[in-house]
């Protein structure tokens, strides 16, 4: 969607800025063992948001372009718009924001598209404030924005976009998790759509205590392995016994794709976010790149084209653009 944008009402900040633009990458959330807790950025693909400071005390979306345009222009129904509405209300700002969203992340891909728009909007808007606020404060407004898309406040796609790298995300704080620089992630996105709300509905039902114990054990192994740089610990723990068994049937070719990654020495593989994308961890970039064709072939075997990305787990956070 293309629309003419009226710049006549853009208000300069105390630092002279009328407009700011920010990029936020895609992300992998849950990471098999940390449902709604763990995530990391996926460098190389993401959303760009341009924000203008305007006289009118409102938030409005002027345009949405790119890979996904079937998104609400109403600010309160859009994660980026809702996040800026939360920011305005909390700071009692006398001015408003106008934004344009350029989407680079496919809708309902399990790659954090709603979070990317949300964080990019906040990073850009923060640059337009007379007194920018802290990352912790921005994170709280991002949680408000993300709730529009998923129906609940959770930060596993948001935290990594503020800090970069693997991040443990509670509702109150963000904790960076050290990961060896050499470790890389492979993410493969099959050209299929799995709505986040439908994926969450699949999780309804009873869970056994033994499942929670096993999942807690796996989370501890992964965190300890990352901290120590011990690939064997991560390999022992990077498996999902709670969520994956309930969501995997919704993703055609998932079992074959996961097996292909493990056959190429992945430390582990599972569903990225709500799916249908799949992620896998490897000790080197070369190993991740070598596995990509096999994982894509698994999806091709069920009639799905796909895209693949190989990036460091320690990929960078969202950033302002010149």
UniProtKB/Swiss-Prot annotation:
| BP GO annotations | threonine biosynthetic process
- Pathway, per UniProt? Amino-acid biosynthesis; L-threonine biosynthesis; L-threonine from L-aspartate: step 4/5
Q: Name one GO cellular component term.
A: cytoplasm
Please tell me which top-level EC class this enzyme sits in.
Answer: transferase
MF terms in GO: ATP binding; homoserine kinase activity
Compartments in which it is found: Cytoplasm
EC number per UniProt:
2.7.1.39
InterPro entries attached here?
GHMP_kinase_C_dom, GHMP_kinase_C_sf, GHMP_kinase_N_dom, Homoserine_kinase, Ribosomal_Su5_D2-typ_SF, Ribsml_uS5_D2-typ_fold_subgr
- Provide the alphabetized UniProt keywords: Amino-acid biosynthesis, ATP-binding, Cytoplasm, Kinase, Nucleotide-binding, Threonine biosynthesis, Transferase
What reaction(s) does this enzyme catalyze?
L-homoserine + ATP = O-phospho-L-homoserine + ADP + H(+)
For the ligand (ATP), the binding residues are: 106-116
Q: Say which domain of life the source belongs to.
A: Bacteria
Biological role: Catalyzes the ATP-dependent phosphorylation of L-homoserine to L-homoserine phosphate.
Q: Which PANTHER family match?
A: HOMOSERINE KINASE, HOMOSERINE/4-DIPHOSPHOCYTIDYL-2-C-METHYL-D-ERYTHRITOL KINASE
Please give the family membership noted in the entry.
Belongs to the GHMP kinase family. Homoserine kinase subfamily.
The name this protein carries in UniProt is Homoserine kinase
Organism listed in the record: Xanthomonas campestris pv. campestris (strain ATCC 33913 / DSM 3586 / NCPPB 528 / LMG 568 / P 25)
């Amino acid at each position: 969607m293309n629309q003419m944008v009226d710049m006549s009402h853009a208000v300069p900040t105390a630092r002279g800025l009328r407009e700011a633009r920010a990029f936020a990458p895609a992300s992998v959330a849950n990471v098999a063992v940390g449902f709604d807790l763990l995530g990391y950025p996926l460098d190389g693909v993401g959303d760009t948001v341009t924000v203008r400071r305007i006289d009118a005390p409102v938030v409005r979306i002027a345009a949405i372009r790119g890979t996904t345009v079937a998104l609400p222009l109403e600010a309160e129904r859009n994660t980026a718009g809702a996040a800026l509405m939360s920011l305005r209300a909390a700071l009692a700002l006398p001015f408003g924001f106008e934004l344009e969203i350029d989407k680079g992340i496919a809708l309902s891909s399990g790659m954090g598209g709603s979070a990317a728009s949300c964080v990019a909007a906040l990073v850009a808007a923060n640059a337009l404030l007379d007194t920018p606020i802290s990352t912790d404060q921005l994170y709280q407004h991002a949680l408000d924005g993300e709730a529009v898309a998923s129906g609940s406040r959770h930060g596993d796609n948001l935290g990594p976009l503020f800090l970069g790298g693997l991040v443990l995300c509670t509702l109150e704080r963000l904790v960076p998790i050290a990961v060896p620089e050499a470790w890389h992630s492979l993410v493969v996105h099959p050209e299929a759509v799995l709505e986040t709300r439908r994926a969450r509905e699949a999780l309804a039902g009873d869970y056994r205590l033994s499942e929670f114990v096993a999942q807690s054990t796996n989370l501890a192994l992964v965190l300890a392995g990352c901290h120590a740089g011990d690939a064997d610990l991560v390999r022992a723990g990077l498996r999902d016994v709670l969520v994956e068994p309930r969501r995997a049937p919704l993703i055609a070719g998932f079992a074959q794709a996961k097996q292909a990654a493990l056959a190429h020495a992945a430390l582990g593989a599972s569903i990225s976010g709500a799916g249908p994308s799949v992620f896998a961890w490897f000790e080197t970039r070369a190993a991740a790149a070598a596995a990509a064709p096999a994982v894509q072939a698994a999806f091709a075997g069920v009639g799905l084209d796909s895209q693949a990305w190989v990036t460091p787990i320690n990929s960078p956070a969202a950033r302002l653009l010149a």
